[in-house]
Regions:
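Sec-dependent signal peptide recognition
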Residues: 2-10
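Residue-level marker of positions within ordered structural domains that often coincide
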Residues: 6, 55, 98
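C-terminal motif of bacterial Sec signal peptides marking the signal peptidase cleavage site
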Residues: 12-15
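A structural "domain/chain start" motif
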Residues: 17-86
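Surface-exposed short loop/turn segments
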Residues: 17-39, 75, 95, 99-125
């Protein structure tokens, strides 16, 4: 009986413990370019190489960053980027430049193409 009482007490108390349920759903955000493309009045005859955008380490994470007061940054807990912002913004920029026909050819840097111009960009906050 002395052994049975602690076991029953543990069994009863374990029924009071609430197991965590599924957490909030994670939301994925995709950066898009909804604006219309303005055509260039003239196309430059060169090849433009677009280097992947530089970004501080804070903005290379999978979670979006927010700030509630100056000098502080935090990550959203239940939100994610579909891909790193710098990579996605570089792709959107390249698509926009190709569609606007500013240069005869727009190519990513490192694609094995010899270019006449190189565009370097940086993400700043």
């Amino acid at each position: 009986m002395n052994r049975l009482l602690p076991c029953l007490l543990i069994l009863l108390l374990s029924g009071c413990v609430r197991l965590p349920g599924p957490g909030p759903a994670v939301t994925y955000h995709v950066l898009t370019d909804p604006g219309p493309v303005a055509m260039s009045p003239s196309t430059h005859p060169g090849i433009l190489l677009v280097r992947e955008m530089d970004a501080p380490a804070l903005y290379q994470a999978a979670s979006p960053v927010y700030s509630r007061e100056a000098g502080t940054r935090s990550y959203y807990q239940y939100a994610r980027w579909s891909e790193p912002p710098a990579k996605r913004l570089t792709w959107l920029l390249r698509q926009r430049l190709e569609a606007a026909r500013v240069f005869a050819v727009v190519s990513p840097l490192g694609a094995g193409v010899r270019g006449d111009y190189q565009l370097n960009t940086r993400l700043v906050d």
